[in-house]
């Protein structure tokens, strides 16, 4: 390729003959239908700019490129995109044709909805993508909103294997281990005004996985310390059996944790307690504790 002082999408207007001549000379690259490029296309900065150009032209990131994006990994060439158009792939961009493209903007990048993109991935990466695309407190609701009316049996299986709603790697590891032990779980389960990392679906057991930095930064983060104690008390008086584990134990003693959770299912109470929700200890302490207590 001839050296070029600029790098990025070519947006100028040139004649067909000039474009053909530049393509042959290597000073212009056709990366995909509608997008021509000046300069190198190998560096991370160039690929990042290419992704931005693809977004501008309505191409949605998908497959392994979307997996890399969610995992905060450098996106490698060729970039994989989904489009409703039938176009030819190149060495720089692989185009996946879909009948109906459903997209969502993530950090300024146009992406195919995760539940649709997994069809282009092997199982392990597909599950990891679902974990990240539908993480957090609203993950389950987002998944329901983005799921098409009909999904393949494989996608259903992948969704069931993903730890939808979990916030962290330790939580996902624990959820999968409990499922393998026959215990179905819900992540980010609400009890009163609080959210718990894990709730066993068939038992009144809630589980919290504590990360060291979250609970020791700044004040143990004094606010977190105070909030956690009232949170535990609230669940306990409602009739839940509360279990808490440090994230380090999930990595080091996972089998022991699972064994204890299984035993807990034998002793947990079957009925919850009806509480007077007007009492202030069933509201968050941030609403009624003096500021100097935080």
Task: Label the model's feature ranges.
Residues 1-151, 267, 273-294:
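Short gly/ser-rich loop at a beta-strand->alpha-helix junction or flexible surface loop bordering the NTP-binding
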Residues 134-294:
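Surface segments flanking catalytic/ligand-binding clefts of nucleic-acid enzymes
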